[in-house]
Structure formats: structure tokens, C-alpha cells
Regions:
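Glycine-rich FAD pyrophosphate-binding loop
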Residues: 8, 24-43
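FAD/FMN-dependent oxidoreductases across multiple families
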Residues: 231-309, 315, 321
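C-terminal helical "tail/cap" subdomain of flavin- and related membrane-associated enzymes
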Residues: 311-396
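A conserved beta-strand/loop capping segment in the N-terminal third of enzymes
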Residues: 52-106
Length: 396
């Protein structure tokens, strides 16, 4: 491997691998590196993804990394009122439950096939600076100390990005802006349907967040939850999850075969994702759905844009903030409105009491699948619960 590259991408999650793939495809000399010795391990999310980003980015679904397919959602209120929504009827798309251990490796392989070098077990220790400009990274690996020069560094190093912080960008998170997530992979459990994703709401279940059951086969599922740091009452997330498993009949016979945990940023994107010689993507840029905590879709799209912009900038010999700002403009045009909408929805959701959530579930249960929409929900509430409708005004 070289020690001089056009672009170094730090972090081989979906964002980083897509950035490396796009940049290498455009002719750049790219290094993709990750601190883990095995890409995709440990898993740090529920592993749900819609088919849209795969279609849009030209990635053919592969049964090796699709653990389950979903076509419906069940939402359960604090008192047990269940609302069932058909994904196909309402949004016209299929959902997948991934095997991230295989999926993440697959994306890194796509980058490698386009010509990117890939290094695992390589920990970045700092940025190489020259006259105030980023010129590469310091790292260490099994060989010892390492230096890689680069015209552009792409930070895909996750929540609380050290790369961004070293570059002078504030990555500190308030308690209200981060969820602590924990997940069990369980076997031997019962399902209402192996194609239905289940979500459970309530302050006793997951304060400020929700619990989930995502099927991964006939009797296996990801069972997890996220709790908002400002609402957790000093209890670790795993205690809430253990309680959820104990009180949920479908899970009581199940056995835990894996535990994963991590933090999820739910406070909206950082203000700036570009500096001279630097782009910030994925969880590092907090490009995450604040309502669900899902970030794979946004990460892949942002990575693809970043890799394309970085490669073009290098080819032009101009890697200034002004030139790289094309990335900032493109990702915000494509994603910012959606991210803002979900952030508003999250803020409304955490303001609701358990009684409010029950009333909301009652209203939703009266709407036909074909008519599920924000407008239909608000019309139903106008008839049944105008007081709750006022609390939901922030959604409009």
C-alpha cells in the first residue's frame, strides 16, 4: 500500500465505504481504513433498511446479507393498543432486516473492487497538519506507527467524531440529543408475523425512545430499545431492555445469543460538515433520523455524495472549503428537509404522556391502511381528541 493518497476515508461503516466506492469509481486514489479488525463487528443498530437507498445507489440485494424482509409495521402504545400498518399499501416499498456483519463487509468490498485500498485494525491518532491545513492522518496498526498523506480526509468515524473534533468542529452532544441503545439478538421466540416490524412506546418501556422487535427468520429477532439520556432516570438502557423482555410474552421463551450497544445522535445534523481538505459524513455528521434513530440510508447517500465531490475536487486541484462545499449543498438539498421533519416529530413525541400516546394509537387505529397519512391522522384527532391535536401542532 502507498503512504500517499488522494483521499483517506476514516471508518468503514456504510457512510465510509460508500464514500470510498464513489471516489475510487471517479478515478481517485483512495484509502479506506477502520479501527476494527473485522468490518461490521460489533453491530450497533437494529439493522433495518428500506429498499430505496439500495435501488438509488445501484446495490443489488443479496440474500447473504438480508436476514429478513418486512412488509408491515405494528406500533404498540403504553397500554397495549396495537396499530398495524402495511408498508406496501402505505409507502409502496419493501423493508429489509440486514445482517450488518455481512452487509458492511459487502459495501467495503464494493469500494475495494472499484480500486480503493482497505486497511483494518488501524487506529487514527491524529491529523497531519501543515500551515493550518489538513495533510493526512497519523495512525497505528499491527506494524506500529503509520502516516498517510492525503489531499482530502473524509471523517466517517461515528458519533462524537474525533476527526471532526481535531479539526476544530464541536461534536459535543447534550443528553437530550443522544439515545443510549442496546440490543439482544434472540432465538426461540414467537412471532405474530415474521414479516412485521414491531415498535413499543411508553415511559416505562423506553423513556424518550421506543423498543423494537425486528424479525430475522422464523424464530430469531433483534430485540432492542433506545432511551433518551435526559429521560433515563439514571437507569442503564440494558435494565429497561431486560424488563421489556420479561414483560413481553412473545419473548419470554427466547434465548439471548448476542448483545450490542451504542449511542445514537438524535439532535439533528451538525452545523457544518466541510472544511478545507475535510468532509464529515454519516453518524459523524449526525445525519440520522431523530425519530427512529435510523441512519444507514442517510449515511449511504451522504457517503456517495462526499466521495463524488472529493474525487472531482482532487482532480481539479482545488480542495478548499469553498470547492468542497458542493457536498454540503448537495446533501442538505437531498436530506435536510427530511431530517428536520423527523427531528420535529421526535420533539413532539417526547412531549407526549403515556395517556397521550394511547389516545394517538386509538386515533390511528380508526384510519384505514390506504389512508394512513399525517392529514388523515389529524382529521381523526380533530373529531376524537382536539386537545391532543393541539399538542401535535408541531408536526404541521
Amino acid at each position: 500500500m502507498n503512504d500517499k493518497y488522494d483521499i483517506v476515508v476514516v471508518g468503514a461503516g456504510p457512510a465510509g465505504s460508500m464514500a470510498a466506492r464513489a471516489a475510487a469509481r471517479s478515478g481517485a486514489n483512495v484509502l479506506l481504513l477502520d479501527r476494527r479488525r473485522e468490518i461490521g463487528v460489533p453491530v450497533q443498530c437494529g439493522e433495518a433498511l428500506s429498499e430505496d437507498p439500495l435501488k438509488d445507489l445501484g446495490i443489488k440485494p443479496d440474500p447473504r446479507w438480508i436476514a429478513g424482509k418486512t412488509n408491515a409495521v405494528k406500533i404498540v402504545s403504553p397500554s397495549g393498543i396495537a396499530v398495524r400498518i402495511s408498508e406496501k399499501k402505505v409507502v409502496g416499498k419493501m423493508g429489509y432486516i440486514l445482517d450488518r456483519k455481512v452487509f458492511d463487509k459487502h459495501l467495503a468490498m464494493l469500494a475495494a473492487k472499484e480500486g480503493a485500498d482497505v486497511r483494518v485494525g488501524t487506529v487514527v491518532d491524529g491529523l497531519l497538519m501543515e500551515n493550518g491545513k489538513i495533510k493526512g492522518i497519523n495512525a497505528h496498526g499491527i506494524e506500529g506507527r503509520l502516516e498517510f498523506l492525503a489531499d482530502v480526509v473524509i471523517a466517517a468515524d461515528g458519533v462524537g467524531s474525533r476527526i471532526a473534533r481535531w479539526a476544530g468542529i464541536n461534536t459535543a452532544l447534550k443528553l437530550v440529543d443522544i439515545e443510549s441503545g442496546v440490543q439482544f439478538q434472540m432465538v426461540g421466540i414467537d412471532f405474530e408475523s415474521s414479516s412485521t416490524m414491531e415498535f413499543y412506546l411508553g415511559s416505562k418501556i423506553a423513556p424518550g425512545g421506543y423498543a423494537w422487535i425486528f424479525p430475522k427468520g422464523e424464530d430469531m429477532a433483534n430485540v432492542g430499545l433506545g432511551v433518551l439520556g435526559s429521560r433515563a432516570e439514571r437507569r442503564p438502557a440494558i435494565q429497561y431492555l431486560q424488563d421489556f423482555v420479561k414483560r413481553t410474552p412473545d419473548l419470554q421463551k427466547g434465548k439471548i445469543i448476542e448483545i450490542n450497544a451504542g449511542g445514537v445522535p438524535v439532535g439533528g445534523p451538525i452545523k457544518r460538515t466541510v472544511k478545507d481538505n475535510l468532509l464529515i459524513i454519516g453518524d459523524a455528521a449526525r445525519q440520522v433520523n431523530a425519530l427512529t434513530g435510523g441512519g444507514i440510508d442517510y449515511a449511504m447517500r451522504a457517503g456517495d455524495i462526499a466521495g463524488d465531490v472529493a474525487a472531482k475536487a482532487v482532480a481539479e486541484g482545488n480542495v478548499s472549503e469553498k470547492r468542497l462545499n458542493e457536498y454540503e449543498k448537495r446533501w442538505r438539498e437531498k436530506m435536510e428537509r427530511s431530517l428536520e421533519r423527523y427531528l420535529k416529530a421526535k420533539n413532539v413525541l417526547i412531549s407526549l404522556s403515556d395517556e397521550d400516546l394511547d389516545e394517538l394509537a386509538k386515533a390511528l387505529s380508526k384510519i384505514k391502511f390506504e389512508n394512513i397519512s399525517l392529514t388523515a391522522m389529524l382529521k381523526s384527532l380533530l373529531k376524537t381528541n382536539p386537545k391532543l391535536l393541539w399538542k401535535l401542532r408541531g408536526l404541521v
